[in-house]
Amino acid sequence: MGPRLQRGLQGLVSKEPLDPRTFRNVLGQFCTGITVITTMHDGAPVGFACQSFTALSLQPPLVLFCPTKVSRSWQAVEASGHFCVNVLHEKQKDVSARFGSKDTDKFAGIDWRLSKLGSPIIDGTLAHIDCSVHSVHDGGDHFVVFGAVHSLSDVPHKKPRPLLFYRGDYTGIEPDKTTPAQWRDDLEAFLTATTDDTWL
């Protein structure tokens, strides 16, 4: 780590403590999708709801998510070395609630199958991304986990709307936003920029 980066990181640390509630309220203004990260551990399926998932790199194809350091589900992912990202759609609030809870058997009543790497794919999700753990980095009270993408689900012909989380509650997008967006070439900074079969 070079001196400039070290100084930059030191400057990011607030000298005055931030109120946790205010911090969460402000960050809650940023709308996110909801995923379920899954793996297998000791022959049993393991999973947890996660809104910190995001795309990271196209070449090589990488994604990331940020589990808390005390997460037992993350420990299972770390032990297995692989995971599947299940992207939820708007009618899967119950799935999100189940995997965001402390239920001992989160997969009870959930239909699933194994991915090529051996992680659970939850039936009926908007998309799934099969990954191996690429690297793990420190992120305060969380870890930042980079995942190497091995395979992807097909994009459904009929696109259901995604399940979103905003200001501490579930939300969605307007019905007319599920139609494909017109092609545009001015979004090079967007890792998931629109193509002929995607939308903003």
Place the predicted regions along the sequence by residue:
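Basic, polyanion-binding surface patches
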Residues: 2-200
